[in-house]
């Protein structure tokens, strides 16, 4: 299905330095009626003035935010998914393939994702490709669980401590609803 795009420049979109359009990033929500998935689209407009016409580049990316399951993320998909989760609580399991305790808690973590249908559960493999994100989030040991609300870490559990993880999720859910 072709995409038709009509742009009319607003006075605020004009760049005073170039007399044309400056690069801008627009975010738009794309409604999706599927349950239990929410989709959000990001449209980036980068326009430049060329003579009497403007060149516009637009890209659209869809991010799925699922509840009732564990979603694998990486350094490129983590923040868009957290932002798309909106007001939902997000729990991130940071693990490695070789970690014994990570393997032990993985099925319990999956069961938690099925129990809490109002929480988004994510997994991040702390491999060399994802090291920048792991460093940004301050990981020191695996597994580490980070609980986020409104794009901010509100709780952390280090180690495969199932009871501590459940207590942290319950505390964060209570704080979010109260």
Swiss-Prot record:
Transmembrane segments: none annotated. It comes from the Eukaryota. The keyword Disulfide bond applies. The active site is at residues 99, 102. It holds the Pfam family Thioredoxin. Keywords: Chloroplast, Disulfide bond, Electron transport, Glutathionylation, Plastid, Redox-active center, Transit peptide, Transport. Thiol-disulfide oxidoreductase involved in the redox regulation of enzymes of both reductive pentose phosphate pathway (Calvin-Benson cycle) and oxidative pentose phosphate pathway. Under light or reducing conditions, activates in chloroplast the glyceraldehyde-3-phosphate dehydrogenase, the phosphoribulokinase and the fructose-1,6-bisphosphate phosphatase, and inhibits the glucose-6-phosphate dehydrogenase. Belongs to the thioredoxin family. Plant F-type subfamily. This is Thioredoxin F1, chloroplastic. It comes from Arabidopsis thaliana.
């Amino acid at each position: 299905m072709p995409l038709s795009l009509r742009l009319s420049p607003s006075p605020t979109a004009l760049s005073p330095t170039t007399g044309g359009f400056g690069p801008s990033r627009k975010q738009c929500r794309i409604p999706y009626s599927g349950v239990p998935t929410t989709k959000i689209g990001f449209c980036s407009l980068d326009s430049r003035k060329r003579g009497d016409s403007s060149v516009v580049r637009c890209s659209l990316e869809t991010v799925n935010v699922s509840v009732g399951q564990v979603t694998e993320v990486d350094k490129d998909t983590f923040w868009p998914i957290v932002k798309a989760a909106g007001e939902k609580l997000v729990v991130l399991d940071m693990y490695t393939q070789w970690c014994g305790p990570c393997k032990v808690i993985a099925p319990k973590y999956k069961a938690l994702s099925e129990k809490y249908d109002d929480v988004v559960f994510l997994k991040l493999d702390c491999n060399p490709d994802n090291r920048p994100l792991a460093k940004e989030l301050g990981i020191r040991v695996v597994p580490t669980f980070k609980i986020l609300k409104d794009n901010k870490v509100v709780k952390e559990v280090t180690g495969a401590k199932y009871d501590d993880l459940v207590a942290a999720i319950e505390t964060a859910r209570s704080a979010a609803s109260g």
